């Protein structure tokens, strides 16, 4: 069975994704703080606004779990089971829906899809989760007591002010400019893309993983239908149509032979407990 969709679907669902073949080089170009942001957007599918709302209390260092919680709502429970909106108001007198700069950062919709179950972020490969927690030790965090005004958000400037999506996007585009010089063959793919292209990359990697499994004859008996379900859950898509955009694309030879995808594929296959689908958390036999 062919995994190549018809051309009409491809055109209708066209997206601008960061080329996953260059993801590791992007991480190498970044400083530790930028690397953490790129890992959350690229390997977890988070939006910039979601990443920048990470707080000092949303990281489980022991079990290597991360949560991104909407600061304007009490729907997601944070530290000690307290709604994030109430926590910020009571501890810091912050109203993220009204006060600047918080209101300018926003959040959009939560991820994963069933966030009320307090599910942590999903990583498409454990090697990136490991790199994230290794990189955390390289970031010099400014204590809350040294921040004026006081706040708990993780990503800050040297003066303790919150990083903005605009600042992060400028750094990302500077890195893309360097990558274009290093890899002229990727100029077209790198032109005009922003940080959101890393979220798109996540969807493309997951869809490429499905294609790789099908093309290889699924020797490991991986539940192929679960891959799309997991992608929808991880990216927080309420509609399956939003997820289908990534899967309804033509597959090229690099899906089968590409060095990067083979490396990611191998790490996925090696994890026998199937971390990537998280069947207990992400809905075993759950269909849209």
Where are these regions (language model features)?
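The alpha-helix within a helix-turn-helix
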Residues: 41, 52, 232
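C-terminal secondary-structure termini that scaffold catalytic or DNA-interacting sites
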Residues: 93, 256-288
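Catalytic-site neighborhood detector that most strongly recognizes the C-terminal catalytic loop/helix
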Residues: 222-225, 234-266
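Conserved tyrosine-mediated DNA breakage-rejoining catalytic core shared by Y-recombinases
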Residues: 54-135, 141-144
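Short, flexible/disordered intra-domain loops and linkers
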Residues: 1, 9-13, 78-82, 211-224
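Flexible interdomain linker/hinge and immediately adjacent N-terminus
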Residues: 1-22, 158
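Short, basic (Lys/Arg/His-rich) helix/loop patches that form interaction surfaces
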Residues: 161-162, 169-233
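Basic, Lys/Arg- and aromatic-enriched nucleic-acid-binding interface segment
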Residues: 20-48, 227
């Amino acid at each position: 069975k062919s995994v190549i969709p018809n051309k009409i679907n491809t055109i209708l669902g066209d997206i601008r994704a960061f080329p996953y073949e260059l993801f590791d080089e992007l991480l190498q170009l970044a400083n530790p703080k930028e690397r953490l942001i790129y890992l959350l957007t690229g390997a977890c599918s988070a939006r910039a606004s979601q990443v920048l709302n990470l707080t000092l209390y949303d990281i489980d260092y022991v079990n290597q779990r991360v949560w991104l919680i909407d600061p304007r709502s009490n729907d997601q429970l944070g530290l000690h089971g307290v709604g994030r909106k109430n926590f910020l108001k009571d501890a810091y007198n912050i109203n993220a829906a009204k006060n600047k700069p918080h209101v300018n950062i926003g959040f959009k919709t939560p991820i994963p899809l069933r966030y009320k179950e307090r599910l942590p972020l999903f990583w498409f490969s454990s090697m990136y989760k490991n790199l994230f927690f290794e990189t955390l030790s390289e970031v010099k965090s400014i204590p809350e007591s040294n921040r004026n005004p006081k706040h708990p958000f993780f990503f800050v400037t040297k003066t303790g002010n919150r990083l903005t999506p605009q600042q992060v996007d400028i750094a990302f585009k500077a890195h893309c400019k360097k990558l274009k010089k290093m890899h002229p063959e990727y100029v077209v793919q790198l032109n005009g893309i922003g940080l959101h292209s890393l979220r798109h990359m996540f969807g493309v990697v997951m869809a490429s993983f499905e294609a790789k499994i099908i093309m290889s004859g699924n020797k490991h008996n991986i539940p192929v239908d679960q891959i799309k379900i997991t992608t929808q859950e991880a990216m927080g898509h309420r509609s399956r149509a939003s997820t289908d955009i990534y899967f309804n694309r033509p597959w090229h030879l690099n899906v089968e032979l590409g060095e990067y995808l083979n490396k990611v594929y191998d790490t996925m296959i090696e994890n026998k407990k199937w971390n990537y689908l998280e069947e207990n958390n992400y809905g075993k036999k759950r269909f849209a």
